[in-house]
């Protein structure tokens, strides 16, 4: 009887594995395609019933762009931001206030261990915009939702005509965002940030006085470009603007990703000469040493296996004080 029960359970597991592994693969009937059936990334921009560009889709950073710094090539072009350094495209770096420059240097010298990404806290929309994990845009009347695979982040951009609340006593990790259409461009203003924010992995700061303007355009089916201006007089001597480029990932969906905080993980973070954190470079080796009973399912895109005994840490890490 036991043997028969075991065989039935084993068969159910075998049958269910292909199903769970394939569920994100679903052809988008709206996607333009070439003669060989591949998605035509240069196809026409999709539009909503009212004629506005439809930003909906699953996106990731372009293969060459947000991961590699590059200065602007013309007066009309803005420097490309990177995941590690949002100001990497500026010849002289970001226009930091003296105290903010000192804070950034301190964060980098500490291997960015207090980055919200390490402690599984919300990253803020700037880090999310350049993150290597995909994000999904859902455009509907009155609101645009951005669902981030990493940290399961959710951001709302209200397009119903409302204004940003004045003197809002409740700061937000993502700020409070309202958008309006200017032709084919969605212009998004965000204010109301928490103090102590991080714009990138290095730790370029964002304070409670920060204000951002993002200009979303979709020049073709496969691309979204975001021109982002940061205006934070407390941390920077002047406003500055960067460009972020996203490419659509057609015929798929975002999946579950869990971040389980662990003090030991933060203490292990060291940077390799390649510029990648050694803790992530060696993730595969560490996972192999974990007992099978504690190993997460293979479709989890996180280092959760190294963080199963995490203590609780709810407070925002110390970010320094303005001088």
Question: Where do the model's predicted regions map?
Answer:
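PEST-like low-complexity, intrinsically disordered acidic/proline/serine-rich tracts
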Residues: 2-6, 11, 17-305
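Cationic, low-complexity basic patches in intrinsically disordered or flexible, solvent-exposed regions
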Residues: 308
């Amino acid at each position: 009887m036991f043997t028969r029960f075991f065989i039935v359970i084993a068969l159910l597991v075998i049958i269910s594995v292909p199903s769970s592994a394939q569920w994100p693969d679903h052809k988008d009937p709206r996607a333009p395609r070439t003669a060989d059936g591949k998605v035509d990334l240069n196809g026409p921009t999709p539009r909503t019933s009212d004629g506005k560009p439809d930003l909906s889709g699953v996106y990731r950073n372009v293969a060459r762009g947000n991961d590699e710094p590059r200065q602007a090539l013309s007066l009309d072009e803005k420097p490309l931001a990177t995941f590690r350094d949002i100001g990497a495209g500026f010849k002289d770096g970001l226009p930091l206030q003296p105290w903010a420059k000192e804070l950034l240097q301190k964060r980098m010298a500490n291997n960015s261990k207090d980055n919200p990404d390490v402690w599984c806290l919300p990253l803020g929309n700037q880090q999310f915009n350049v993150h290597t994990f995909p994000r999904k845009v859902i455009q509907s009347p009155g609101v645009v939702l951005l669902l981030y695979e990493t940290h399961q982040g959710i951001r709302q951009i209200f397009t119903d005509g409302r204004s940003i609340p004045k003197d809002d006593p409740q700061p937000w990790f993502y700020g409070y965002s309202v958008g309006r259409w200017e032709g084919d461009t969605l212009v998004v203003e965000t204010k109301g940030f928490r103090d102590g924010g991080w714009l990138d992995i290095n730790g370029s700061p964002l304070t409670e006085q920060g204000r951002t303007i993002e200009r979303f355009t979709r020049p073709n089916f496969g691309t979204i470009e975001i021109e982002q201006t940061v205006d934070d007089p407390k941390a920077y001597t002047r406003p500055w603007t960067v460009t972020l480029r996203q490419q659509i990932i057609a015929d798929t969906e975002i999946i579950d990703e869990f971040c389980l905080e662990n003090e030991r993980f933060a203490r292990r973070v060291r940077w390799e000469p390649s510029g990648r954190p050694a803790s992530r470079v060696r993730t595969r080796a560490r996972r192999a040493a974990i007992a099978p009973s504690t190993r997460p399912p293979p479709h989890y895109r996180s280092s959760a296996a190294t963080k199963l005994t995490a203590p609780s840490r709810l407070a925002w890490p110390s970010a320094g004080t303005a001088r």
